[in-house]
Amino acid sequence: TIYSDDSVYEMEEVVKDGIKKEIKELCFTDHVDYGIKRDVDDPLGPVYLNGQPITNVDYPKYYKEYLHVKEKYKDQITLKLGLEFGIQVHTINQYEALFKAYPFDFIILSIHQVDDLEFWTGDYQKGRTEEEYYTRYYQELYDVVKNYKNYSVLGHMDLMKRYDDHDGYDSFNKHKDIITDILKIVIKDGKGIEINTSSVRYKLDDLMPSKDILKLYLELGGTIITISSDSHQEDHLGAYIEDTKKQLKALGFKQYCTYNKMIPEFHNL
């Protein structure tokens, strides 16, 4: 929503559009990226990008508006409170504090930066081979899931493929050992993974995470999976979710999950 720096979608508009599209349940997961952004009330002030101030979500406002729309539209749609935590090892403590501050239903754990370098700008990849930047990315993800436990699902696990050289690099087989180790921790901790339908929007030739990762997750005993349209504007809202359910079923999954107060609720595919 408007509370993230990559969207201008008003929270109430999201809700109205969701009702219009006959979506039964919506969860807000605006972005938080400590390390490269500061909080609204940080005494150091905002970080500037291209002359524009960028901050994390204004949590008190976000929570207040969420409570308002949840009550206002309660007879038409179920709303859930979440955030997407863009964690790095050195920012874990800030997320521990944030998690305790609000009664979240759902938290996506994602890696959007490594060493405070952004993927989408190419800063992180600069001067590294694909082998190097994938290795470092998965190592960061491994270190984070080993040390941080207050989350629901792992977001777009192979996100790097959105920003790699698009030359057919086989990231799954080259990094299968650490991907396996990450998934084992996720499963042991009772967490899940997110399947992110924006892969269609970005014209990627596979699901996100890939079918290989999804099959491996299933083989390892993983059952918790959520489906997200990663919407930043109206035409993204709920996009490709039904199609993704069919693909999950074809891979052998029986159920998908939604969350309530950080507890997964299972629904048949």
Regions found by a protein language model. Name each.
Residues 114-154:
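Hydrophobic, well-structured mid-protein blocks that either form specific transmembrane helices
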Residues 7, 79-92, 125-140, 165-177, ...:
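Active-site glycine- and acidic-residue-rich loops that bind
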Residues 82-130:
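Hydrophobic alpha-helical segments and helix pairs
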Residues 26-28, 79-83, 107-109, 153-155, ...:
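Hydrophobic faces of well-ordered beta-strands that scaffold small-molecule active sites
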Residues 33-57, 108-128, 192:
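Active-site gating loops and adjacent loop-to-helix segments of metal-dependent hydrolytic enzymes
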Residues 1-85, 89, 98-101, 163, ...:
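An N-terminally biased module of ancient metal coordination in phosphate/nucleic-acid-related enzymes
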Residues 20, 65-76, 96-108, 145-149, ...:
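Acidic (Asp/Glu)-rich catalytic clusters
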Residues 1, 8-16, 37, 115, ...:
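Charged catalytic cores and adjacent phosphate/nucleic-acid-binding surfaces used
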